[in-house]
Amino acid sequence: MARAPSPAKSISMAIVVIGGHSRSVGKTSVVAGLIAALPEYHWTALKITQYGHGVCSLNGESCHCATDDHSWAISEEKDRSGESDTSRFLIAGAVRALWVRTEQGRLAEAVPTIRLRLAESENAILESNSILKFVRPDLYLTVLDRATADFKRSAQEFLDQADAVILHAPKEDRPGWTGISLKPVASRPIFHIHPPEYVTKEIAEFVRMKVSSDLKPKA
């Protein structure tokens, strides 16, 4: 699948996207780990969540409001308690953390505002698979865990676009998922992790090298 067009951005800006094949595989921990390991990039961090029907995009709670009223929302995190994912981003060192909530299938409606937020950023790191339909990052990493059977369609769709794989060290020889081939990333770097460590020195250096090679000095 062809990559989405890149948003208008500063020539000295980098966009990193962290995806994964299911919930609870460590995407948020990888984002927070990279922010902490690479503070010199002054990250703006975005977490993108798509909800099912009957859940309000304004606050993530169940509701019966008109779909067109609350199809998406973006809020900026201010709390540093560490209780939410975006709060963890701030604690890790992000200069700004944003939570994007949309109804399933309606992410496109939030994209113009997302692009504006990206344009305001020095560098950006996003937690999402589906954003790849609309944004072309400088680097895309996917987090995989053989012990988790679920494999999102969005993760399958963009697997071949991953620049590298962050793979939980196998607890079993056979992956929990079925009907999924990792051939699209067979030639890509694979970094094994052992939680609670989600970002190794090798991962941080790989990201630094890739991001630095794409950055151009400011005019």
Protein language model regions, located:
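Intrinsic disorder/low-complexity segments
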Residues: M1-S10, P217-K218
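Extreme N-terminal starter segment of soluble prokaryotic enzymes
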Residues: I11-V16
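Conserved beta-strand elements of the Class I
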Residues: V17, H42-L46, T142
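Glycine-rich phosphate-binding P-loop
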Residues: V17-L34
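N-terminal phosphate/diphosphate-binding loop that engages ATP/GTP or pyrophosphate donors
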Residues: I35-T102
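Active-site rim loops that border cofactor/substrate pockets in soluble metabolic enzymes
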Residues: W72, V95-E120
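Conserved catalytic-core segment of NTP-binding enzymes
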Residues: L116-N123, S128-K210
